[in-house]
Amino acid sequence: MITTVEDGKAITLQGNPEHPITQGFLCWKIQNALKFVYSPERLKRPLKRVGKKGTDNFKEITWEEAYREIAHQMENVRTKHGAEAILPFHYYGHMGLLNKQLPQRIFTTLGTSNCSPTVCSNAGRTAMQYVYGGFWGLDPEEIPSSKLIIFWGLNGPWSNLHGYNMVKQAVRNGAKFYVIDPLKTGKLGKHLAIKPNTDGVLALGIANYLITSNMYDKEHVEKYTHGFEQFREVAKGFDLERVSRITDLSVEDIRELSEDLYRIRPSFIHLGFGIQKHL
């Protein structure tokens, strides 16, 4: 991002055309970032509650006063009840490299309790670790050269705009694009309007079809996987007709998706939080 500054104040924000992912384009949120930075309603000093919880009785204090009071309260709790009585909780407001990790170093040093900050991403992360051994994905710069792209449980135009623009490049280059989502979230690609909460059934149905059709890499499975026979038994009960009834997707679409997954290489599968955010 390129920022123009005059007299110590940011005047304009522009995308960096040399950036390999954004390619000079800023999302709508960042295009309007200066409105938030210089908003007269923005809080610039800490507020301390001086009334009962649930009321709007606050007063401004200095940063030094805030640091001192917070440190005093934390030390008081640690002395009386132990460090584990302190429970830090933070997530999306602190996703920068420094402002995310530095507070965690403080809490780790103090020996406080720690909990997962989210009910969504860690569930998927743990599942990915069990299946793949890790949760790191492909480089987004590989999207334009992919021949098959699947966005599963992901609203690309809204939550992954830069990646979605790369998908457009790939489609222009001849790639096939699927979107698996109950809602139609864009004009691009083939939309599979899956019934909510049935993504696992679709995955098992795809696996069963590929296994029974002998469309999988046996050498890779034998060399790098454990429990394949048990997985085969679990997937066996999910034939295309049953999966179609449960997911509200046609047998033809499920078969086409399955065969494309086997035949079209290289592929790029992007899993979104949508798969995890249901009961």
Language-model features: locations:
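N-terminal export/assembly segments and adjacent metallocofactor-ligating motifs
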Residues: 1-213, 250-254
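Scaffold signal of the M16-like zinc-metallopeptidase fold and its non-catalytic homologs
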Residues: 39-43, 211-238
